[in-house]
């Protein structure tokens, strides 16, 4: 077994016997009582998890922190009173690096932590690390990426095609959680702000590694109706828009704007237009970003004969933006939504 497989196996051994009570704590009192009860706080289960990892020959250490919901750990005056839980860092001797996990996780997705534990300042309690390496950023342990590739044809008033989606990081974990809840092969991954177009699909395939919960691949064939009004067809070249509403509706902002995590959304779409129609209108390419480039979006569209290709990238490089960036964020979000809703207009020749 590889190092990662051993860590996943240890997590599964824990979860087969014990369940999390929903409580986050910093200390554990009596492991024997926890085992007898069959459940415990994350701290109680984490101590048992560290013992199991030791049986697998893996060294592990606590990583103490203040949860996001209870406030950031002060940079200038870190205090023991501000600490309220810990998670586990398992050490890989071959790569001389750590992977992070917590017993509150539903799935053993290494380095993909519950959002309440995703903080940018946590303390690794390892005697073997120099002082400068004991502060850990738990938000940027891995990449959170959605890559979607769509190949479609417009014919007889319908859009038919094939969609492949590859998910990495938090998106992959959320997808797997939804699969567990539904327990059937009828799930389509959509982000909370995804477009709600109605479509039919078939041939759903989901590919995943039983030991790697940080990645997953989904593909299916789909069919949806194109809007037909007054002899014209109206088609969104994104086919599956990412955003449809602007959550930033306040006129001003006093507190920082906090996102769950940094992420990247990349859509590639190839669209074949129908015979007997010509393009009357087509969206323009567009690029926008914040002054510090922590948020940017590129919408690049090209037409070549009856083929339209679109590359759309939306990337958030940070989990937090300052209040003085709020107006800029509002404007960018509004413009990006306009592009998500932009249509190709086709008229008959």
Where are these regions (language model features)?
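A sensor for short, sequence-defined functional sites
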Residues: 1-349
């Amino acid at each position: 077994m590889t190092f990662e497989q051993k860590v996943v196996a240890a997590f599964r051994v824990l979860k087969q016997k014990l369940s999390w009570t929903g409580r986050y704590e910093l200390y554990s009192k009596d492991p024997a009582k926890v085992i007898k009860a069959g459940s415990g706080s994350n701290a109680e289960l984490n101590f048992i998890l560290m013992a199991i990892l030791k049986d697998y020959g893996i060294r592990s250490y606590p990583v103490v922190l203040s949860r996001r919901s209870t406030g950031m750990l002060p940079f200038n005056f870190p205090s023991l009173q501000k600490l309220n839980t810990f998670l586990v860092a398992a050490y890989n001797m071959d790569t001389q690096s750590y992977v992070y996990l917590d017993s509150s996780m539903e799935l053993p997705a290494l380095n993909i932590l519950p959002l309440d534990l995703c903080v940018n300042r946590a303390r690794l309690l390892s005697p073997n690390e120099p002082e400068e390496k004991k502060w850990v950023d738990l938000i940027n342990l891995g990449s959170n990426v959605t890559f979607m590739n769509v190949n479609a044809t417009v014919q007889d008033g319908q859009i038919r095609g094939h969609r492949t989606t590859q998910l990495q990081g938090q998106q992959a974990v959320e997808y797997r959680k939804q699969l567990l809840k539904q327990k059937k092969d009828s799930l389509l991954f959509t982000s909370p702000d995804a477009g709600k177009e109605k479509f039919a699909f078939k041939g759903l395939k989901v590919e995943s590694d039983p030991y790697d919960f940080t990645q997953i691949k989904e593909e299916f064939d789909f069919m949806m109706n194109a809007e037909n009004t007054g002899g014209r067809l109206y088609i969104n070249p994104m086919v599956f828009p990412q955003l449809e509403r602007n959550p930033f509706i306040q006129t001003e902002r006093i507190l920082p704007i906090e996102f769950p995590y940094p992420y990247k959304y990349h859509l590639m779409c190839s669209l074949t237009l129908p015979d007997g129609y010509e393009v009357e209108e087509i969206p323009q390419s567009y690029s926008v970003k914040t002054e510090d480039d922590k948020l940017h979006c590129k919408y690049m569209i090209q037409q070549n004969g009856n083929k339209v290709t679109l590359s759309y990238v939306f990337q958030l490089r940070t989990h937090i933006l300052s209040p003085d960036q709020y107006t800029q964020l509002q404007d960018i979000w509004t413009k990006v939504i306009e592009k998500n809703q932009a249509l190709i207009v086709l008229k008959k020749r």
